[in-house]
C-alpha cells in the first residue's frame, strides 16, 4: 500500500491566495485580533487523494484514504509573529481555519514521512489538541523547519 496522499508544498504569496482561503485566513485572524500582512511566511500544500491501488478499492471506486471526503484539498500554513495559522479547504469538507499561539505550540516528534503534527491547539476536556500538517516537495521541509524555529523562538525570547 502506497502513501495515502500525493503532496506538493510551495511557498505561498498571501496577496495571491484564492478568495475563499484569503477570506477564511483574514476572518479567523481578525476574530483573534491578529493583523495579517502579505509578507508573512506561508506555504500551501496541495494534497491529492489518489484512487486506491487495492483490488477491492478499485472495484468499489475508493480512494487511498477512504475516510477523506475530497479527492484533493489545500492546506495553508501561515506564520504570524505570535501564532501559527492553518486554513484547510476542500470541495466536500468546506473551509476551516484554526490557530495556536506559538508560545504554547509544540512540534511532535518523530515527524512522519509526509508531514508533522503540531500540538497546542484547543482540544477537548481541557487538554491540548494536535493537528497533522501534511507537506511535500519542494518546500515541505522548509515549512517544517520554519514552524519549528518560530515555536522555539517564541518559547525562548
Protein language model regions, located:
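Low-complexity intrinsically disordered segments
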Residues: 2-34, 94-157
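Anionic N-terminal interaction surfaces
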Residues: 1-76
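Phosphoinositide-binding peripheral membrane targeting modules
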Residues: 54-115, 127-128
